[in-house]
Design a protein with these regions (language model features):
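Non-heme Fe(II)-dependent double-stranded beta-helix
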Residues: 8-21, 29-161
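Glycine-rich nucleotide phosphate-binding loop and flanking beta-alpha elements
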Residues: 34, 169, 254
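Hydrophobic alpha-helical signal peptides and transmembrane signal-/tail-anchor segments
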Residues: 1-7
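A structural signal for short, well-ordered beta-strand segments
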Residues: 147-150, 181-183, 268-272
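Solvent-exposed residues in well-ordered beta-strands and their adjoining turns
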Residues: 33, 184-186, 273
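Catalytic core of non-heme Fe(II) oxygenases with the double-stranded beta-helix
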Residues: 118, 132-136, 144, 157-237, ...
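Residue-level "contact hotspot" at macromolecular interaction interfaces
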Residues: 19, 237-239
């Protein structure tokens, strides 16, 4: 299904909040220049060239329920990545000995979850005046940065992201306090795996959560609640131009398809939480640490 929606400019004085409240997402053009996008991609290419991942840390990333429990649920490498920069791979990129069978640059699904803290270029974007301005237009008083990730959506093999709500993984009390910013470093199209949303679905709450299990037990995370089935006809495609950003409400249902095209779809994405009068769940897989408390978005 396709629909028409208003695309805001990051230079506009018009607040995006009415559409964000109505649909659960907003597209804004021009957050980054083409040159800034290229700089972020070049820095990421350098990080990948330099990576050295031990065999036992070579796990794949998935949003599928069963695969997620098998891979991330049993992996200390995943659950302790909140204050580190770590690598998560596409399916089918290793042989039975754990060696790459595709070029390293084409093997990675995502890198996370602390790019916003430890990589200067990504930190600069995260705390940029434009990002702070967007947060202020939406009325955020004390936003903090929860995590920062780079998603590759590799050409030909970039994995499907099944329908989900971010609050399943990033739960707060009350709900409605988490927002994702999804920045397209290349054009995101229907062909290379752009996002699809169910407009207005953020008004229906959540039906399941991913939580930490008791210490010393496996898997390290588990799901509570039921996995919702969604009507495919309700999803709308949301293409984004290079340098644009999608603001994503924590409870809006969204997904992306497998990238079967010859084009990658690189994205830098991070999540904010309104910290004022909000409780971050101690059951969430992601937890602040002594090394990296959730940093305030607003800088002096």
């Amino acid at each position: 299904m396709f629909c028409f929606f208003f695309v805001f400019s990051c230079e506009s004085s018009s607040p995006p909040s009415p559409q964000y409240r109505r649909d659960g997402f907003v597209v804004m053009d021009g957050l980054l220049s083409p040159q800034e996008c290229d700089q972020l991609r070049q820095r990421m290419a350098e990080i990948v060239d330099e990576m050295d991942v031990p065999d036992h840390c070579r796990i794949t990333f998935s949003t599928d329920h069963d695969e997620q429990l098998k891979e991330q649920g049993n992996a200390d490498y995943f659950i302790t990545s909140g204050d580190k920069i770590r690598f998560f791979f596409e399916k089918g990129v290793f042989d039975d000995k754990g060696e790459f069978i595709v070029p390293k640059q084409r093997s990675i699904n995502k890198i996370g979850h602390a790019l916003h803290a430890y990589e200067p270029l990504y930190k600069k974007v995260t705390h940029s005046p434009k990002v702070q301005g967007i947060a202020k237009k939406l009325g955020l008083v004390s936003p903090v940065v929860l995590q920062g990730m780079y998603i590759f959506k590799q050409p030909g093999i970039g994995g499907e992201v099944t329908p989900h709500q971010d609050a399943t993984f990033l739960y707060t009390e009350p709900l409605g306090r988490v927002m994702g910013l999804w920045i397209a470093l290349e054009d995101a199209t229907v062909n290379n795996g752009c996002l699809w949303f169910i407009p207005g679905s953020h008004n229906s709450g959540i039906t399941r959560r991913m939580v930490r299990t008791h210490k010393g037990t496996l898997p390290l995370t588990d799901f509570v609640g039921r996995e919702q089935q969604y009507d495919e006809d309700k999803f709308v495609a949301v293409p984004v131009k290079k340098g644009g950003v999608v603001l994503i409400h924590g409870e809006v249902v969204h997904r992306s398809a497998v990238n079967t095209s010859d084009d990658s779809r690189h994205v830098y994405t991070f999540h904010l939480m309104e910290a004022q009068d909000t409780r971050w769940s101690a059951d969430n897989w992601l937890q602040p640490s002594e090394e990296l408390p959730f940093p305030p978005l607003y800088t002096k």
